[in-house]
Amino acid sequence: MSDQFKALIINQEGENFTREVKKIDRSFLKHGDVTIKVDYSDLNFKDGMILKNGGRLVKEFPHIPGIDFSGTVLESDNSKFKEGDEVILTGFRVGEVFYGGYSQIAKVNGDFLVKKPKNLTSKQAMILGTAGFTSLMSAFAIKAREELLLGEKVKDVLVTGASGGVGSIAVMILSKMGYDVHAVTGKKDKNDYLKDLGAKNIIDRKEFEGESKDRKSVV
């Protein structure tokens, strides 16, 4: 691959915030000991905020956003990875503090990477992305609490925000794990979608309006 490649660059000069796809070279990439050819990235809520400069999440400009990506190692100074390894990155404030995945080439700390499982394509990894990772960790936490603290199997699980990215994947995972999933959503047009994912019951979000916000999460 040429030393020049395309990346989405966001910049802030005074009150002027810009987004532009530009050609850059590898000298632009600041941090990391592993260089990756990015195959896929995705779009998360935090990405949307960063792309609109919401929440002032990015402190240094110019910047390359994109909190997730999958790809193939081009160069490595990290003993854990070698050229040709297929890898996944999610989290570690990449795309926020460190340059992210909205680029044809990325350079990151090898400790942020994991090797891609052989039964998962790079595209599938990014279809799941941060939302899938978060949902799975939540499901594991429910299972752990069930086994360690409750002493008996939990039957019913309530998923709020069920039609969103994290929520919809959580509905699918939890139903596959054998739980009766009660999906809360304010979008009636998503009812059939949630049923197809495995929700046993759909609850209108309005039923929770006015209730105390001091409810504790199970995870």
Label the predicted regions.
Residues 132-133, 161-168:
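Glycine-rich NAD(P) Rossmann-fold beta1-alpha1 loop
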Residues 85-86, 105, 176:
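Residue-level marker of beta-strand positions
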Residues 46-52:
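Cytochrome P450 core scaffold surrounding the K-helix E-X-X-R motif
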Residues 6, 86, 180-181:
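Residues at the starts of beta-strands that form the adenosine-phosphate
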Residues 167-176:
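Surface-exposed amphipathic alpha-helices with a cationic face
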Residues 90-158:
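NAD(P)H dinucleotide-binding glycine-rich loop of Rossmann-like/cofactor-binding domains
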Residues 25-43, 54-94, 100:
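Glycine-rich beta-strand-centered segment in the early N-terminal region that forms part
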Residues 175-219:
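Adenosine-nucleotide cofactor-binding segment
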